[in-house]
Amino acid sequence: MSIPVNPNSFKGSFLFTSESVGEGHPDKIADQVSDAVLDACLAEDPLSKVACETATKTGMIMVFGEITTKAHLDYQKIIRNAVKDIGYDDSAKGFDYKTCNVLVAIEQQSPDIAQGLHYEKALEELGAGDQGIMFGYATDETPELLPLTLLLAHQLNANMAKARRDGSLPWLRPDTKTQVTIEYEHDGGAVVPKKVKTVVVSAQHSEDITTEELRKEILEKIIKTTIPAKYLDEDTVFHIQPSGLFIIGGPQGDAGLTGRKIIVDTYGGWGAHGGGAFSGKDYSKVDRSAAYLARWIAKSLVTAGLVRRCLVQLSYAIGVAEPLSIFVEDYGTSAEGRTSDQLVEIIRKNFDMRPGVIVQELDLAKPIYFQTAKNGHFTNQEFAWEKPKKLNL
């Protein structure tokens, strides 16, 4: 059954805000390093079992966790290359891949957990790596079927990284943060973005630019080239570098940990979140693989025209292949008045939700994860879970 919907709650307009962080944010550094280690394992051994966490602070990165793999890993090289890719390549930026201290505390996975996964069985019968709840969300407000608040916040960070790399804004450093507030109108249970009310941008920078000049450059070269003009007007508020100087950033400014940006990684506060982080986890961890599946399901339902906006919940138990429950919230947007139960039946008919099948259908045994840790896990439309499945109704 569906959550009871009050039709009066789907009237009028409202403001909603989402945030994002750039590649050089300390927590995002940790996510990317964890996924770089995961990719290195999967590149040599697709059956690797990885639970890799990362912590970083001034001049230091530590990776720790449980890994069972046949791959021969050079942790120093993997970690330093990830930091280099992010852009911390000089001590003047507050962090340098060449000189940072790299600590490794990796052990093998618990044999008790391995037993629960039933490795001796066929991949299709692989049990879930843990219990948990996972959510997927999709909305027809953008072609990507993502919330516009989050999409714009991600794009602002991505475009700052591009401007830093191509030299058009050479004073930029990797640590950036963005936040976008949009005024929406209800359209039944769907939501329609009307205009951007507020944009917040904070960007780490070198010492050779003034705050006044930085604000001008960010506004003209990043914000106005990223956000479509139709969403901006004379009332749009821009908070660019609201704290003033932002020279000390990255791990020198704040400690970073894997899994601290789970809302940035997913739907920017829309929908719901089961609480499990993604980065550093292989496909047997349903925190990740089933969340990708739930997104695939939600996006497929919207693409098929069955709903305009939906939230999908899945739940699993360790060692059990089939999900324990499936839930769909359509926010009152279901075409032809389909009930939640009917939508669940369509899901069961079209998707095999066992972890061992998910990995095959979504190509999750490949070393693809480093890129997912940048600017959201659902923004890159080349990933398999972003390509809607044609449904048999």
Swiss-Prot record:
Organism superkingdom: Eukaryota
Binding site for L-methionine: 66, 109, 254, 285
Binding of Mg(2+), residues: 19
Broad class of enzyme this protein falls into: transferase
Keywords for this protein: ATP-binding, Magnesium, Metal-binding, Nucleotide-binding, One-carbon metabolism, Potassium, Transferase
Cofactor(s) listed in the protein's UniProt record: Mg(2+); K(+)
GO molecular function: ATP binding; metal ion binding; methionine adenosyltransferase activity
Cofactor annotation comment: Binds 2 magnesium ions per subunit. The magnesium ions interact primarily with the substrate. Binds 1 potassium ion per subunit. The potassium ion interacts primarily with the substrate.
Amino-acid positions noted as binding ATP in the UniProt annotation, renumbered to this chain: 25, 175-177, 243-246, 254, 260-261, 277, 281, 285
Reaction catalyzed: L-methionine + ATP + H2O = S-adenosyl-L-methionine + phosphate + diphosphate
Pathway as given in its UniProt record: Amino-acid biosynthesis; S-adenosyl-L-methionine biosynthesis; S-adenosyl-L-methionine from L-methionine: step 1/1
A GO BP annotation: S-adenosylmethionine biosynthetic process
E.C. numbers: 2.5.1.6
UniProt-listed InterPro entries: ADOMET_SYNTHASE_CS (IPR022631), S-AdoMet_synt_C (IPR022630), S-AdoMet_synt_central (IPR022629), S-AdoMet_synt_N (IPR022628), S-AdoMet_synthetase (IPR002133), S-AdoMet_synthetase_sfam (IPR022636)
Protein residues bound to K(+): 53
Its biological purpose: Catalyzes the formation of S-adenosylmethionine from methionine and ATP. The reaction comprises two steps that are both catalyzed by the same enzyme: formation of S-adenosylmethionine (AdoMet) and triphosphate, and subsequent hydrolysis of the triphosphate.
Family assignment from sequence similarity: Belongs to the AdoMet synthase family.
Identification of the protein by name: S-adenosylmethionine synthase
Originating species: Ascobolus immersus
